[in-house]
Amino acid sequence: MVVSIWRYPVKSMLGEELNSSYLTERGLVGDRAYALIDQETGKVASAKNPRKWEKLFDFRSVFIDPPQVAENIPPIRITLPNGTQTFSDQDKDIDYTLSKVLGRGVRLMKANLDKPSYEEYWPDIEGLAQREKVTDEAMPPRTFFDIAVIHLLTTSTINRLRELYPEGRFEVRRFRPNIVVESTASGEKDFIENSWIGKKLTIGEDIVLRITGPCTRCVMITLPQGDLPRDLGILCTVAKYNQVNVGVYASVLHGGTIHRGDSVLLEA
C-alpha cells in the first residue's frame, strides 16, 4: 500500500507531502521542475556537494497552485531559513534574495538545460565508489533528476536500518523518495526492494512502473534538516549492510493518478 507521496518542486530543497498526484513518463507532475543554477559554474546547485550547498536543506518549496499535465509549470513559494517567504512570480529580485542567503550567486531556473550537471562530494567512508573527492555528474537532458524520474522506498527498509543502527534517526525525509510503500518483509528480504529490480509494479488501477535499479546513496542522507541531526553513521550503515543502496529507481510505463492508500502489486 502507498503510505506517502512526496514532490520536490526545487531540487535539493525540502518539498511537499501529497495526498495524490498525477504520474507521467516524466514522474510526478512538477517534481524537480525547478533548480538553482550556480552563476559561477553553470552547474545545478545540489546538496550532494554540501561544502557549497548544505544550506539548501534550510529552504522549503511548494507550488502556489497544483501543477497540471500538459500545462506550464506554475510558480512556487519558497520559505527561507528565517521563515520569510518569496514567490517566483512576484519577487523580481528572487535570484538576489536566494543568493544573499546562500552566500553564492544563483538563479532560479526551470528544467530546460540540454546538458545539466552537478557536483558530488564523496566523504571518506568505506564502501563508496570514491572517497574524499568531488566529482562532476551529468543529469538526463532537460531534467533536474539525478538518474531516474521515480524513487521508491519501503517501510521495511527504513525499519531494518533502524534495527541495524538504533542510535541513528532513520526517517523517510532523509532519503527524499517520491513514493513510500508499506511492507512487512523480514529476514533475508530486509531490503526487499533489491528483489524488485527488473520487475513491474502496479499501483492502484492504472499506474505501472518498471523498477530499473538500486538507489545508491550519498552524503545528502547524513545532513541536518529540520530537527534531524547531522549523522555520518547513517551513510556508514547503508554502506556496510546494503552496498550503499536505499530504495530503488523506477520508470513509468503507464501513468495515472496516484493516491495515498493505493494498492501495490508486484509482478510474480
Question: What does each of the following model-derived ranges do?
Answer:
Residues M1-A268:
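Metal-cofactor-dependent catalytic cores
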